[in-house]
Amino acid sequence: MRKGILEYCILLIINKKPVYVSDIISELKEAHLIVVEGTLYPLLSRLKNGGLLSYQWQESMQGPPRKYYELTDAGRSFLQELENAWNDIRHTIEKVSVDNTIAVVQ
């Protein structure tokens, strides 16, 4: 499940604007999702190979050129599907949890 959530969060971040890997890691860290580059790069590669992401090289003032990722049209469509699925899951959980309290056994 974490993989699906991580993928969803990454696509949400990239949907805002083209981003560099360290920007993705920083945003995930702020959201308390700790991810290392060794996890992120294969996932980005899989999303790119699946036609959901593209990238462009941009010059950097602080070193070598950087690869900035952005969503393709297919990526935006897939993100919308994930958004719909997430909303369905959230709605289901809310329905199940209404007036549900956890009993404490004494």
Q: What positions do the PLM features span?
A:
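A cross-family signal for key residues in well-ordered alpha-helices
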Residues: 12, 45, 54, 80
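Glycine-centered, phosphate/nucleic-acid-interacting loop/turn motifs that mediate DNA/RNA or nucleotide
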Residues: 51
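Amphipathic alpha-helical dimerization/coiled-coil segments
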Residues: 77-106
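Basic amphipathic alpha-helical segments that dock to polyanions
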Residues: 40-42, 46-47
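Basic, amphipathic "hinge/linker" alpha-helix immediately C-terminal to the N-terminal HTH DNA-binding motif
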Residues: 61, 65-83
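Conserved catalytic-core motifs of GNAT/GCN5-like acyltransferases
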Residues: 56-60
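N-terminal helix-turn-helix DNA-binding core of bacterial DNA-binding proteins
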Residues: 1-39
